């Protein structure tokens, strides 16, 4: 959200609760959709007057990959960077070529280890952090002994921001 806001991008987002959407609006979200109350494919089409969006950052997996493709405008792309649902995606590729869309996978651990590839990105992020434009969102800090509690919070989708385990 914060990077999109810095870049002046119109940002649409989904969440399971209005409370989380409200908090994310503070980070730059302009159009929030509670996917437990409304189908986000329909909502995106309504909000964009049938056009769809240029890109979707998708981290749920399962059915959400195909649904994300349906949210795209012509020649849009879905960037898959996770599978929080644990479900394997199934995608009818006709959805892609019907609108010239593409799906890209991104594994941040791999990219982070590739210093030459990521050098300019780390430099830019560091500049934004130093300028106070980016603010890491820490949801809660747990002592290591409470790792199970922290993990349960993640599994239940009740977290907001990063959960930190304090080792010492």
Task: Describe each model-derived feature in a short phrase.
Residues 39-50:
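Short amphipathic alpha-helix with an adjacent loop that forms part of the alpha/beta core around
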Residues 1-37:
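Mid-domain Rossmann-like dinucleotide-binding core that forms the NAD(H)/NADP(H) cofactor-binding site
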Residues 56-57, 79:
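N-terminal Rossmann-like NAD(P) cofactor-binding module of classical short-chain dehydrogenase/reductase
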Residues 29, 52-53, 96, 134, ...:
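Local beta-strand N-terminus motif with an aromatic residue
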Residues 7, 15, 24, 63-133, ...:
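Glycine-rich phosphate-binding loop and adjacent beta-alpha segment
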């Amino acid at each position: 959200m914060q990077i999109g806001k810095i870049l002046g991008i119109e940002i649409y987002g989904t969440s399971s609760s209005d409370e989380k959407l409200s908090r994310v609006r503070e980070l730059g979200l302009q159009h929030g959709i509670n996917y437990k109350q409304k189908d986000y494919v329909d909502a995106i089409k309504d909000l964009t007057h049938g056009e769809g969006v240029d890109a979707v950052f998708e981290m749920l997996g399962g059915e959400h990959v195909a649904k994300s493709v349906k949210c795209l405008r012509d020649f849009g792309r879905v960037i898959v960077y996770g599978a929080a649902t644990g479900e394997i995606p199934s995608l009818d590729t006709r959805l892609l070529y019907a609108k010239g869309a593409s799906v890209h996978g991104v594994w941040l651990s791999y990219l982070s280890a590739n210093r030459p590839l990521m050098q300019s990105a780390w430099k830019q992020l560091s500049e934004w952090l130093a300028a106070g434009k980016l603010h890491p969102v820490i949801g809660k800090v747990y002592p290591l002994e409470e790792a199970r509690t922290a993990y349960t919070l993640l599994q239940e989708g009740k977290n907001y921001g990063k959960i930190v385990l304090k080792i010492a």
